[in-house]
Structure formats: structure tokens, C-alpha cells
């Protein structure tokens, strides 16, 4: 098999330039199954794509904000996708429009903030590793002009009933943020965000506050009315579930739901670990918000204690 490097530059209103390279690569290597993010269209901003080899894709963004529509966004085991952004506060929106869910089984990295949107669901597999400054993974969408203007309001079609699930390891840089928002959200892996903000929320509409104390605010019309379907095609038993471990020492962790009665057995199931201990003299905070119509089941560990002598610790609500 031939090995080579190629680059393509895409700007606003560009053609789907990377697809030309992918077609050429598959022609030269007919036995190869390509699974990296494919067929991008840049809707806003300046972005280039560097296909390093058969398992590595680099996305280089030179504008502070950019929007890319992808036909598919998958990363298989032993594959890697990296987003290089101008700064830690720069943001990339990657929206999947091809009608299939996203499976992240390899490595996803960025020095900035990524917003991954797929109405058909997102799964981070058990061998996946994510290292970013910030990550928003959601089945809801945002208007392009709202994103560019800084109005981070997301909404979802009534028929969407899919999930965002993490079974791997996600590391958020110190002081960064992570938000999973979908009709169903689950963490059975590891999430680390020291001094950061973590939100796992079930809802249809929400607003992001990237710089305030409350990362995710669920809309008043955000209530889940229908069964939510997991990646295996069966209904989920909880709208927000944490059976893994979440570490946000010195930061905030929020688990929230807006749901109608009898949609699931329990709206929140917390049988894992949430740790938001005091760090660098900053108290941690853990909030579980189940609404008025659902059962919040806690059989795991919530820890917002002080780590050092004399520290009182944060609070749990």
C-alpha cells in the first residue's frame, strides 16, 4: 500500500474538498475500510484538512470560530482525529448530517473547544480517549448565525429520542468544560475536569453559558415525553445515568432532567462516583435536579469534601 500526505484548504461556501482525497485513497487501497470523519463542508470560518496517514486526520482551524458539516463522524480504535484551533477559547462546531450515529472508539484531541452535534446519537466507546479544553456533545442543533453571534441556544426536533453515551476516558483541561445534552445521557467511563464544569442533562432545548457559573440551562419546553432509545436499539431505563466516575475537584457537576411521568423507571440513576472536592482553595459543588415528576436514585458516592486539614468542602444539592 502506498503511504503519502496530502492537504486541502476549505473556506466558507467551499465544495466538499476532502471527499476528493478520500475517493483517491480508496481507489489506491481498495481493501482498506476508512472510518475517520468524512465528507466535510465548511459552513463558516477558515479550516484546512491534513490526512497524515490512513489512521490520522488533522483539522487546522485558523479562525476563532468555525462550523463544519460532516456526512459522518466516526473514529475507530487505533485511529486519531485532532482539531488544532487558534486558542484554548476558540470553538469548532462539527455537525453530522448523514443520518447515522457517531461512534468514537479511538482518540479525539483539541487545544480548544469542540461542539459535536448528531441528532442520531453519539457513543464514546470503552477504548476511546478524548483530550480537549472543552467538549459539548449533543443531539440538539444550533443555528449557524446564533453560534457566530455567541447566542448558544440549542433545540431539537420533537421526534428525536437518541442518546449521548461515554464509556471511555475524557480528560478536560484544567478549568475547562464538558456538557452532554440529549434525551438520554449516560457515563459509564471516566470524566476528568479539575476546576472545570461538567453537565449531564436530559432535555430538548438548552442554552450554554460558557463563562458563567451555570453551564447548561434547560429550556421550559425541554421536557422528555417519549421513550428514549439507546445505541443498542432498546429503551433506556434512566434519562441521566452515571455508573462510572466523574472527577471535578474545585469545580461543579450538574446532573439534570426535565421529563414527563412514567417515561422511564428513574429520571436520574447515580450508582457510580461523583467527586468535586475542594482544590486550590475552591470548593466543589454537586447538583442533581430531577424535576417534579421523576425518581432520582442514588446508590453510588457523592463527594464534595475538603481534601486538606481545615477545609470544609463544597456542597451537594
Where are these regions (language model features)?
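Extracellular and secretory-pathway beta-repeat/beta-biased strand scaffolds
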Residues: 2-317
Amino acid at each position: 500500500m502506498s503511504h503519502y500526505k496530502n492537504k486541502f484548504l476549505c473556506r466558507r461556501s467551499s465544495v466538499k474538498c476532502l471527499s476528493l482525497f478520500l475517493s483517491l485513497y480508496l481507489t489506491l487501497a481498495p481493501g482498506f475500510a476508512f472510518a475517520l470523519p468524512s465528507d466535510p463542508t465548511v459552513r463558516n470560518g477558515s479550516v484546512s484538512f491534513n490526512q497524515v496517514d490512513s489512521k490520522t486526520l488533522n483539522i487546522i482551524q485558523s479562525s476563532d470560530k468555525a462550523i463544519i458539516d460532516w456526512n459522518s463522524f466516526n473514529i475507530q480504535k487505533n485511529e486519531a482525529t485532532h482539531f488544532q484551533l487558534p486558542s484554548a477559547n476558540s470553538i469548532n462546531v462539527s455537525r453530522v448530517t448523514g443520518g447515522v450515529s457517531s461512534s468514537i472508539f479511538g482518540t479525539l484531541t483539541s487545544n480548544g473547544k469542540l461542539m459535536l452535534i448528531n441528532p442520531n446519537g453519539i457513543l464514546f466507546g470503552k477504548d476511546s480517549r478524548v483530550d480537549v479544553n472543552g467538549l459539548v456533545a449533543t443531539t440538539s442543533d444550533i443555528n449557524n448565525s446564533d453560534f457566530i453571534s455567541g447566542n448558544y441556544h440549542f433545540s431539537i426536533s420533537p421526534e428525536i429520542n437518541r442518546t449521548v453515551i461515554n464509556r471511555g476516558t475524557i480528560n478536560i483541561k484544567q478549568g475547562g468544560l464538558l456538557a452532554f445534552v440529549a434525551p438520554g445521557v449516560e457515563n459509564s467511563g471516566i470524566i476528568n475536569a479539575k476546576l472545570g464544569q461538567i453537565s449531564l442533562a436530559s432535555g430538548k432545548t438548552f442554552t450554554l453559558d460558557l463563562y458563567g457559573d451555570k453551564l447548561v440551562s434547560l429550556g421550559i419546553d425541554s421536557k422528555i415525553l417519549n421513550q428514549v432509545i439507546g445505541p443498542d436499539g432498546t429503551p433506556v431505563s434512566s434519562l441521566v445515568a452515571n455508573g462510572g466516575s466523574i472527577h471535578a475537584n474545585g469545580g461543579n457537576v450538574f446532573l439534570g432532567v426535565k421529563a414527563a411521568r412514567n417515561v422511564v423507571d428513574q429520571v436520574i440513576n447515580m450508582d457510580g462516583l461523583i467527586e468535586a472536592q475542594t482544590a486550590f482553595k475552591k470548593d466543589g459543588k454537586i447538583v442533581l435536579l430531577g424535576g417534579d415528576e421523576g425518581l432520582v436514585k442514588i446508590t453510588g458516592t457523592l463527594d464534595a469534601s475538603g481534601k486538606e486539614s481545615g477545609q470544609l468542602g463544597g456542597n451537594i444539592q
